[in-house]
Amino acid sequence: MVSLLTMPMSGGIKTWPQAQIDLGFRPIKRQPKVIKCTVQIDVTELTKKRQLFTPRTTATPPQHNPLRLNIFQKAAAIAIDAAERALISHEQDSPLPKTADPRVQIAGNYSPVPESSVRRNLTVEGTIPDCIDGVYIRNGANPMFEPTAGHHLFDGDGMVHAVKITNGSASYACRFTKTERLVQEKRLGRPVFPKAIGELHGHSGIARLMLFYARGLCGLINNQNGVGVANAGLVYFNNRLLAMSEDDLPYQLKITQTGDLQTVGRYDFDGQLKSAMIAHPKLDPVTKELHALSYDVVKKPYLKYFRFSPDGVKSPELEIPLETPTMIHDFAITENFVVIPDQQVVFKLGEMISGKSPVVFDGEKVSRLGIMPKDATEASQIIWVNSPETFCFHLWNAWESPETEEIVVIGSCMSPADSIFNERDESLRSVLSEIRINLRTRKTTRRSLLVNEDVNLEIGMVNRNRLGRKTRFAFLAIAYPWPKVSGFAKVDLCTGEMKKYIYGGEKYGGEPFFLPGNSGNGEENEDDGYIFCHVHDEETKTSELQIINAVNLKLEATIKLPSRVPYGFHGTFVDSNELVDQL
């Protein structure tokens, strides 16, 4: 999505560490109300619980280094700033939906924290397995500045949390990914880019786009080097650690010998990548190729596919014809094919004219799945199969079943499909499902994989050494009470049997990350490995990293972290050999 500048209210801008001391959200002057949502937070109570937003440490406020402006630019800046102040004042008279209200979206342990330099010799309860040697890193959204208007959880600046483990000891650090937008905002000392989901809706969203383009034309900002936040995915590929969000190119990070994090910069694969890349590229464990998609919400082609050889050489882009720009957050690969979801959550920028969100559920569109050879050169090679009621924000795996002429896809089917982005009366459901695509009849079937269980399973993974091949186990977060995660489930995809690991008490977490053990590469020992989970205790306000044996779900070790770790998104593990080979 495109971005725009935002202006402060009078009285100055505060960075998050300053603003969290005073979070009644004074810039958002709305009447207290109870927001009808699954989170069930009374907004009048949030101002009484200011400690939920207060970090345990403080950060140094960003330095304010204003640009050198000519007379024309100064006049333009004054006029645009005045228009933005008027816009913000107007917005304060209108209620925000829960999906864009920062008092809901970044309350409690969803609120941001400052950076932390390396903290060594952390307390470890239990014993860290000897085979674990490297760095577990996890990405997440962490807004540097207090929102001046709407804000969605996905809008926050990218922050990566790193736990380095060596010889049974652990260290911790967390750092912002220094994206182009964050660097500009930090230099100016205030937010100047918009929130793609929280702010770009309705007439005010159109106004923000106009202000954004005006600032760019006047040279008040540089919007030519990307507007992404790099807050979602992580992948280690071709000796590079990449942080990603689907609104921009990846950003290359580097883990130092001490376990700290550095931003190398926006990475275009040595000039080969010209467009954004989604946050869930697929690394084939056998061929070592990286497969990716890129979607555009404004102009055709709305979707493109490409892949990178193990040494980072990009294939020609294959344009995939779609009738409307579609949100494609994830996809899947098999040994020989790519599975492309063309689903019902689409972008209709014209909806902003009627005061609505441009991210909409199109009930008239029929969802479908595209099966395409990995080495396809023409869109005519794609087999499209209709697949109603199969909206999956994430696909966990897929494989080929030659005996039945089918492609088997494992994903969590969500309904209502757009409930993450738009306010809905229905409660969200995320059902772990098996979708079978018959390549001969060109029909699909879907069934729930759980036996006599009604539980929301979302963020998670399978053994990545088996990606694209038949897998037996999936490790998925138990999203209860939504949107919190009270534990994770180990699901047998063959039998539907589910075993739960619950954090207990007021402890909640996020993605269960599976790290294969010494023998966790083959089909027989697929679950040999360990689960990493960042866990936060909402009663004691402390965070920890739990390491659980994936075979028997027994807790092996708990690493006590020196500061709060907000609930976040996706992670990966960089082993000691990969650390040495980093570029």
Swiss-Prot record:
InterPro entries: Carotenoid_Oase
Disulfide bonds: none
EC main group: oxidoreductase
Textual note on the cofactor: Binds 1 Fe(2+) ion per subunit.
Top-level taxon: Eukaryota
Annotated compartments: Plastid, Chloroplast stroma
Binding site for Fe cation: 280, 329, 394, 570
One GO cellular component term noted in the UniProt record for this chain: chloroplast thylakoid membrane
Tissue: Very low in all tissues. Expressed at the point of organ attachment and the abscission zones in the plant.
Protein EC: 1.13.11.51
Reaction(s) the record says it catalyses: a 9-cis-epoxycarotenoid + O2 = a 12'-apo-carotenal + 2-cis,4-trans-xanthoxin; 9-cis-violaxanthin + O2 = (3S,5R,6S)-5,6-epoxy-3-hydroxy-5,6-dihydro-12'-apo-beta-caroten-12'-al + 2-cis,4-trans-xanthoxin; 9'-cis-neoxanthin + O2 = (3S,5R,6R)-3,5-dihydroxy-6,7-didehydro-5,6-dihydro-12'-apo-beta-caroten-12'-al + 2-cis,4-trans-xanthoxin
GO terms assigned for molecular function: 9-cis-epoxycarotenoid dioxygenase activity; metal ion binding
Predominant cellular place of this UniProt entry's protein: plastid
Oxidoreductase found in the keyword field: yes
Induction / repression: Low induction by drought stress.
Cofactor(s) this protein requires: Fe(2+)
Single Gene Ontology BP annotation: abscisic acid biosynthetic process
Keywords, sorted A to Z: Abscisic acid biosynthesis, Chloroplast, Dioxygenase, Iron, Metal-binding, Oxidoreductase, Plastid, Transit peptide
Keyword Disulfide bond: no
UniProt similarity note: Belongs to the carotenoid oxygenase family.
Function: Has a 11,12(11',12') 9-cis epoxycarotenoid cleavage activity. Catalyzes the first step of abscisic-acid biosynthesis from carotenoids.
Name recorded for this polypeptide: 9-cis-epoxycarotenoid dioxygenase NCED2, chloroplastic
Species name: Arabidopsis thaliana (Mouse-ear cress)
